[in-house]
Amino acid sequence: MVTNNKVLLTNLILVMFLGSLLLTGCNNALTNESSSSDGVSNAPTQPVSTNISSNEMFDNLPRLEGMAKVELIVNGSPIILEINGKDAPITAGNFVDLVQKGVYDGLAFHRVVKEPQPFVVQGGDPQGKDPNFPVAGLGTGGYIDESGRRRSVPLEIKQVGDSEPTYSKGLGQQSGVRSPNVVLKHDRGALAMARSAQPDSASSQFYIALADLEFLDGDYAVFGKVLEGMNVVDNINQGDRIESAKVIEGAENLK
């Protein structure tokens, strides 16, 4: 009974972190284009389309047709990320494109949750380019393109056995599925996109899992993993910055 109570308490703590970290960590207002407030929604989300090629909203988003590797330098040490465009082409393409544009250079990890147990490190808010912007106030920003519009990418989840990902719809606990059979899972070291309660609200903010986080599978888009430097990730603290980010392999796969 004591063991079961501990398990229940652990799960409750993780769910609380999910509500206060990832969902509020991406956008509080989603800029002026949306007034949606963040929070865990129990209502099922409706997919815009399971075939992204038919959706004009995402026609011009970059795609990664294959694999790539990205090197982050944090606290003077490298973190090598594998970026999976095979199973998450749009999410991966967005990240690689932003790396090549220099968006992540100098940005802070504004949320780091290690207690009461390891959870995630989260960064990628472009507002952090301003050295006077308080780190504690980060978490609402996304990438603004040359036209002044915020780039949003669809929720992209590929299930085992499917030839294409499903878009714009959570397939995990947010849709009532406890253990979805997804290709890219929230294992320790997984690289994924933060978003608000709206499924297609991810932009530039990402997180790295500090532990296996199965309860996030199917609801947040994993698009890569840490290949080398997980010890560096484990030692990231709030306010630490990405000194540089560059594509070291597979840049030719960005379309």
Regions found by a protein language model. Give the residues of each.
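Bacterial N-terminal signal peptides that target proteins for export
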Residues: 2-13
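Bacterial N-terminal signal peptides
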Residues: 12-22
